[in-house]
Amino acid sequence: MSLLDYFRAKKEPTTATTAKERLQIIVAHQRGERDAPDYFPAMKQEIIEVIRKYVQIDSDQVSVQLDQNDDNLSVLELNVTLPEKP
C-alpha cells in the first residue's frame, strides 16, 4: 500500500457516526416543532387536504417545515412526492 493510496481511500462511516447524525436530525426536527406556532398543525393538515383535491397522495408523502431565523424571518418549506403519470 503506497502513501497515495492511503489518502485516496474513502473511509466508511462508523455506526456511531451514523447514529450521531441521525440523532442530530431528530433533535433538530423536534426543536423545530416545539418552536412552531399554535396554528401550524392545522395549517399543515389543510395544505395536505388541498393537495389531495388534485393528486392522490398519502400524508407521509408531504413534508412541511417552518424554519425561523433570528432576523424575524420565517420560511415555510413544503416537499411533496408526487406520483408518476400513468
Curated annotation (Swiss-Prot):
Q: Does the keyword Protein biosynthesis apply?
A: no
Q: What GO terms describe the biological role, i.e. biological process, of this protein?
A: cell division; regulation of division septum assembly
Entry-linked SUPFAM superfamilies? Cell division protein MinE topological specificity domain
Instruction: Write the record's keywords in alphabetical order, separated by commas.
Output: Cell cycle, Cell division
| Domain of life according to the entry | Bacteria
**Which InterPro entries does the record match to this protein?**
MinE, MinE_sf
The record, for Pfam families, names: MinE
Coiled-coil segments, which residues?
none
What is this protein for, i.e. what is its function?
Prevents the cell division inhibition by proteins MinC and MinD at internal division sites while permitting inhibition at polar sites. This ensures cell division at the proper site by restricting the formation of a division septum at the midpoint of the long axis of the cell.
| Similarity comment text for this entry | Belongs to the MinE family.
Q: What is this protein called?
A: Cell division topological specificity factor
The primary gene name is: minE
